[in-house]
Amino acid sequence: MAPHSADTAGLVPSDELRLRTSNSKGPEQEQTLKKYTLEDVSRHNTPADCWLVIWGKVYDVTSWIPNHPGGSLIHVKAGQDSTQLFDSYHPLYVRKMLAKYCIGELVPSAGDDKFKKATLEYADAENEDFYLVVKQRVESYFKSNKINPQIHPHMILKSLFILGGYFASYYLAFFWSSSVLVSLFFALWMGFFAAEVGVSIQHDGNHGSYTKWRGFGYIMGASLDLVGASSFMWRQQHVVGHHSFTNVDNYDPDIRVKDPDVRRVATTQPRQWYHAYQHIYLAVLYGTLALKSIFLDDFLAYFTGSIGPVKVAKMTPLEFNIFFQGKLLYAFYMFVLPSVYGVHSGGTFLALYVASQLITGWMLAFLFQVAHVVDDVAFPTPEGGKVKGGWAAMQVATTTDFSPRSWFWGHVSGGLNNQIEHHLFPGVCHVHYPAIQPIVEKTCKEFDVPYVAYPTFWTALRAHFAHLKKVGLTEFRLDG
């Protein structure tokens, strides 16, 4: 749909923009392209042999991996369709660089069914007018202001404050005072700072939006391992699954459910009688999110090789070491040291630890759930592996903001109050989101793309629990 506003000054016309950004080859080259199936591509799934599918073409990017500015993100979906991740992480001009790595085109085959949960086709994949325009506008903002979107000076100060607060509260909770109430006070702060590591440090680090220096960004991403959870598994679930297939049932691992399950977030999912009360008991169970991730989910993903519909990629030796050594380091400083040098009995220590993890779990659950599990968002139902709507427009339709221009919530939530902007531009440091938010909202209005922003966090949280109550009472429907 064309914009219904005449305010397009400085924009490249859509047709010209397509020509300038298209990665397609000429007619003679098209005829020489080899044909590959998804099964063929899936065999090339390591950093040493990395093929990607982007807009139906097959690319061998193995030689580019050592020079890739985004570091390991280039092979996070090695051997799979990476269309959505490629486009959301790269400026438009990078499309032109793809041609040199093109080795063929994707063709359907009888064996495609086993890869269907890793591939989803959106309308207007390469030439979605809304996305081309909003990307051009946001890129122009950063270029005209001479700003690197991956960098913001506040991030270093913020990270030092969070990590310092985490370890200070850890010490004060377990080693400083024998008073249970004093220790509980600091244990709760430890839980708060652990959540802040999750939303403010590792989130940007694992999205490649913390810094332009690859090694440093990777280290900041591994801060999640420092607080007990796995950065590798987080990238698989969040970057590979959630960002590619937001709110699409049976594709997005963030809304996955078993049958039966304690939670139901869409009417296309199985309903049990107790879902009528999920808006009550989930308020409590959300607190177990961090504990579940640390002690159960990460290991299940490793040993089963999947996170819901997402097939877990092969670990590199470095990723393997970070995964297991991170778990051992966490167990050592969190359990061994307090048991040897701490001032509390085993039972008191365990109670303090669980209390801290409940705070972490509630913070993470509430901040993420209000963005995608409310009545005002869409839960797309694909037909034949296709979604009716462009990928970018569907990112907006499946996501909400809250307090989008709040300095306080921008920092406390790690930019999750600007989830729409984050889903469109995951490679941008979250501190920049308030600046580009008006650009995104304005463009959405011009293209009739629904843009939902709750005025406060509490409004968004109430909307989430109202949705849980409504869905818990609604009968199963195939059409959502």
UniProtKB/Swiss-Prot annotation:
The Swiss-Prot or TrEMBL record lists the needed cofactor(s) as:
Fe(2+)
Q: Give the membrane topology.
A: Multi-pass membrane protein
Catalytic class of the enzyme: oxidoreductase
Keyword Nucleus among record annotations: no
CDD domains to which the protein is assigned, alphabetical = Delta6-FADS-like
Which residues are connected by disulfide bridges in this protein?
A: none
* One Pfam match: FA_desaturase
TM segment ranges? 151-171, 173-193, 280-300, 322-342, 348-368
Q: Give me the ranges of the annotated region Disordered.
A: 1-30
The UniProt record lists the EC number as 1.14.19.30
The UniProt keywords, alphabetically, are: Electron transport, Fatty acid biosynthesis, Fatty acid metabolism, Heme, Iron, Lipid biosynthesis, Lipid metabolism, Membrane, Metal-binding, Oxidoreductase, Transmembrane, Transmembrane helix, Transport
Q: Tell me where on the tree of life, at the top rank, the source sits.
A: Eukaryota
Cellular component terms per the entry's GO annotation: membrane
Renumbered ranges of motif Histidine box-3: 419-423
Catalytic reaction list: an (8Z,11Z,14Z)-icosatrienoyl-containing glycerolipid + 2 Fe(II)-[cytochrome b5] + O2 + 2 H(+) = (5Z,8Z,11Z,14Z)-eicosatetraenoyl-containing glycerolipid + 2 Fe(III)-[cytochrome b5] + 2 H2O; an (8Z,11Z,14Z,17Z)-eicosatetraenoyl-containing glycerolipid + 2 Fe(II)-[cytochrome b5] + O2 + 2 H(+) = a (5Z,8Z,11Z,14Z,17Z)-eicosapentaenoyl-containing glycerolipid + 2 Fe(III)-[cytochrome b5] + 2 H2O
**Cellular compartments annotated:** Membrane
Q: Where does heme bind?
A: 68, 90
Chain positions of motif Histidine box-2: 238-243
Q: Which residues form the Cytochrome b5 heme-binding domain?
A: 33-107
Q: Which PANTHER family match?
A: DELTA(5) FATTY ACID DESATURASE C-RELATED, FATTY ACID DESATURASE 2
Domain text from the record?
A: The cytochrome b5 heme-binding domain acts as the direct electron donor to the active site of the desaturase, and does not require an external cytochrome.
What the record says about family reads: Belongs to the fatty acid desaturase type 1 family.
Q: What does this protein do?
A: Fatty acid desaturase that introduces a cis double bond at the 5-position in 20-carbon polyunsaturated fatty acids incorporated in a glycerolipid that contain a Delta(8) double bond.
Indicate what this protein is called per its UniProt record: Acyl-lipid (8-3)-desaturase
Whose protein is this, by species? Answer: Physcomitrium patens
High-level lineage: Eukaryota, Viridiplantae, Streptophyta, Embryophyta, Bryophyta
